[in-house]
A protein has these predicted regions:
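Conserved P-loop NTPase motor "coupling/switch" region that bridges the ATPase
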Residues: 113, 130, 158, 184, ...
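Walker A/P-loop NTP-binding motif
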Residues: 78-82, 97-112, 203-205, 236
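A conserved SF2-helicase RecA2
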Residues: 453-511
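Conserved pre-motif I regulatory segment
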Residues: 54-89
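Conserved helix-turn-beta segment of the N-terminal RecA-like "Helicase ATP-binding" lobe
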Residues: 124-148, 236-239
Length: 511
């Protein structure tokens, strides 16, 4: 095969007619050579004839954006353009969002699709998808359909190139989405569609037509067991699974007792065949990926948190009117705002005001589910640690906890067990209690439940996983829900000492 001027493919074939009879933009140039237009539709047809040719994105696309694609991202984008319905199982932190954006942009430029619908968790609608679209496809129009139904409908009617919406928001405006003509649907963290009996799954399935492009993305397919693959396969590769779930379950599981099932010996192969076509890169396979990747997840404050947060902020505005702001006062008030954001605030009398943490906890569970190894969670406040570990235990997520009041002997035992045993899966740590000297390379994901105000503590805490003995690429996830959290994380990212700039930061918050 030869590529001619990035426009055509010169193929050597025993029988050129097998191509010229089905591809209008092709012609035989000799008894065994055929020239074919190098387009998306022609390439799909050639692949259907078992003639392996590269995607035209490889030669005909100017890769847009602030950053050049890494090798695995180019390969992923190429794969997606060659499959109308497909899975992308690249691990979290490998940049699959950008790969999907480039692939979609290329298809738009080729006139194959008009616009794309992105369905994802609320926590990454803005911080991941909109941010990445602005970074990699800034020439495209982007909007987020979130809020009351009337607002969502108005946004959809505007027909942006990329429309971002949360899972359960799709049902509210499904008719509007169908009418708007979104011919590519990208589902991020697609494991939320594993249950083919759920209303969420049925709504999505009603939007997927034979001509619809559909890419399902998740780093952890069938994470809870082989039966989870059924709903995903029914969307992308329905011919690869039986019509009914129970028949699929019998294929991949066997009954141990009345309420217990176990995977069959060759269930992984069965799942692999069903979840096709698919591409997967682990972080370790991405040789040009940075050793440490940082991502942000947005978390909405609850109404209770917003009430207390705004009340305290207004009080701060009144107190500083005409007064000199000291670093001590600024640090104290900022600390209280961070406490409210995290889930528990301490009063002057030493009592604790506890807030609803369900929004933040739901996002944390998503991160844990996506992680292929163990997880460290850094939580600056003691009472929040108690709340969090209680909830993890209730949900069956094995965990251990390190706070300042845990003895040195107990810490050593907890660290040893975390490093050498299958459980606990999660270690919840107060940053000041274990930021230095400890090796915790059994984990490759670090979650900051809330930011620390110490640049040194932040760097040292992240270094617990990113150090000698770590065999995997690592991801740091920052959970953020309030203005003060976003500003503190931004300063930490830019390696600015928060303590040195605390007064300036305080003034910013009050503006």
């Amino acid at each position: 095969m030869q590529i001619i001027d990035n426009k055509a493919l010169l193929l050597k074939l025993r029988n050129p007619k097998q191509v010229t009879t089905v591809i209008p933009k092709s012609k035989a140039v000799s008894d065994h050579e055929v020239l074919v237009n190098w387009g998306v539709q022609e390439t799909h047809t050639l692949r259907g004839l078992n003639i392996k040719v590269p995607s035209p994105i490889e030669g005909r696309y100017v890769w847009t954006g602030k950053f050049a694609p890494m090798s695995h991202q180019r390969t992923t984008s190429s794969f997606l353009t060659m499959h109308q319905k497909a899975f992308c199982f690249n691990e979290a932190g490998t940049g699959k969002t950008a790969s999907a954006i480039w692939a979609a942009d290329f298809l738009m430029k080729q006139g194959i699709i008009k616009r794309a619908l992105v369905i994802c968790p609320i926590s990454i609608m803005d911080s991941a998808w909109r941010a990445d679209l602005f970074s990699f496809a800034m020439h495209r129009t982007v909007d987020i359909a979130y809020g009351p139904a009337a607002k969502r409908k108005k946004i959809i009617a505007g027909k942006p190139d990329f429309l971002i919406i949360n899972y359960d928001g799709v049902e509210i405006v499904k008719d509007d989405i169908a009418a708007a003509g979104y011919d590519l649907i990208i589902v991020d963290e697609a494991s939320h569609y594993k249950n083919a009996q759920s209303k969420r799954w049925k709504v999505l399935n009603s939007l997927v037509k034979p001509e619809t492009w559909l890419w399902l993305m998740t780093g952890t397919p069938a994470a809870q067991g082989p039966e989870d693959a059924f709903g995903l396969a029914k969307l992308v590769n329905p011919a690869g699974v039986p019509k009914f779930f129970n028949a699929w379950k019998d294929m991949v599981m066997y009954k141990v007792s009345q309420y217990r099932w176990k995977p069959k010996e060759h269930s992984e192969r069965t799942v692999h065949r069903a979840l096709q076509p698919a591409i997967r890169f682990t972080k370790e396979e991405c040789l040009d990926l940075p050793d440490m990747t940082y991502v942000k997840r947005d978390v909405a404050l609850t109404k209770q948190q917003e009430l207390y947060y705004n009340r305290l902020k207004n009080q701060m505005v009144m107190e500083v009117a005409g007064a000199q702001i000291t670093a001590v006062n600024a640090a104290v008030m900022m600390g209280k705002l961070l406490q409210i954001s995290a889930g528990a605030s301490y009063t002057e009398s030493g009592d604790t005001v506890q807030f609803d943490i369900n929004n933040r906890y739901s996002v944390l569970k998503e991160v844990i589910a996506e992680s292929t190894h163990k997880v460290l969670i850094f939580v600056p406040f003691k009472h929040v640690i108690d709340m969090l570990t209680a909830q993890l235990t209730k949900d069956g997520i094995t965990n251990a906890m390190i706070r300042g009041d845990v003895s040195a002997g107990d810490r050593t035992e907890i660290f040893k067990q975390f490093q050498t045993q299958p459980d606990p899966k999660v270690l919840v740590i107060q940053p000041q209690a274990a930021a230095h000297g400890v090796t915790l390379t059994a984990a490759n994901t670090v979650v900051w439940w809330a930011p620390t105000s110490s640049l040194e503590t932040y760097a040292q805490a992240n270094a617990r996983v990113h150090r000698k003995g770590q065999a995997n690429k690592c991801t740091v996830v920052q959970l953020q829900g309030s203005g003060v959290e976003r500003r503190v994380y931004k300063m930490l990212d830019e390696k600015i000492d928060v303590h040195a700039k605390v007064v300036d930061l305080y003034k910013e918050l009050l503006d």
